[in-house]
Amino acid sequence: MTIFSLPTGAVVDRLPTGAVVALGYFDGVHLGHRAIIDTARREAEARDAVPAVWMISSEGGGYKRDSLEITCEEEKHALLYEAGARYAVVHDFSEVRGLAGEEFVRLVLKEALRVSCVVCGKNFRFGKGASVDSDGLRTLCDNVGIDTVVVPHVTDVCGDTVSSTKIRRLITDGDVEAADLMLGRPYSFTSTVLEGKRLGRTIGFPTINQVPKQGRLLPKNGVYAVCVEFFDGGVRRSYAGAANVGVCPTVASDVSEDVLAREGVACAERRVCETYIAGFDGELYGREVTVRFLRRLRGEKAFSGIDELKEQISRDAVAAAQIYNEIYGKQ
């Protein structure tokens, strides 16, 4: 078990006694998760305690996911802090998978963490084989003097119940606009810009090429209006962009196989995000860049030649800039 202080990520020896701890996996840190953490924050304020989260590590031993992740742990920690948590207790699944519900409450929550209150969502399950639900958690915590708050389901502005499973499906289907409503922010990933042969520049549309970190979701193949962010001279810059996601996007094939291999991407599965950044003509190779998906523009398309390709990229760039301006204001 590792305890991090947020937002720095520094490891600390102990969680302050009497903390209010939100329980969950928190993939995506969506609106439902934020409601849980906000409840923990308010409970902590009332008790003069610290708000914290407990979660299973996606990068630790023994935990096997059957789906790609919405957020990596680094992103998750930053979002948890933004939502109100001040400590993150991260457990390797191998350390807790054999614990019965009663053992988890007694050994982890009561003895190791010394919490005063736990907060969870209605669907939270724990214990060996996920055998205990939120009602069972309340009963077990009552037995050892820990208070329990169960937060009801949260819906988005369209009235749909928010869940990580639904968000993954929406992203996979390319409906990033609906996913963004449940997340409460645009879906995004951050990764290093890969070096290529600069083929985009030869047709007047320089692009950056990125491969998300292993295990991360990418939307359905196609073209998206995006917001592109990176630091320049210590200042965060934001630009409108048109991103093409696919196995072999328009000019992303200029990313050599040895570069992809260094990123751990097999040739047969090299889904690349290739992004044209409107109004930017600088150098970003080797730098960390964040791409935020705003809206799907179109599916994949074959082109008869360079002229047709250039015309389509130009139309995509105009459409993407209009969407960006609607959300963020004119550049």
Predicted segments, located by residue:
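Glycine-rich, highly charged phosphate/nucleotide-binding loops
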Residues: 67-76, 97-105
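A glycine-rich helix N-cap at a beta->alpha junction
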Residues: 75-89
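Classical nucleotidyltransferase
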Residues: 96-206, 304-310, 314, 328
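Short beta-strands and strand-loop turn motifs
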Residues: 22-24, 54-55, 88-92, 117-122, ...
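Phosphate/ribose-recognition catalytic cores of enzymes acting on nucleotide-derived substrates
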Residues: 196-331
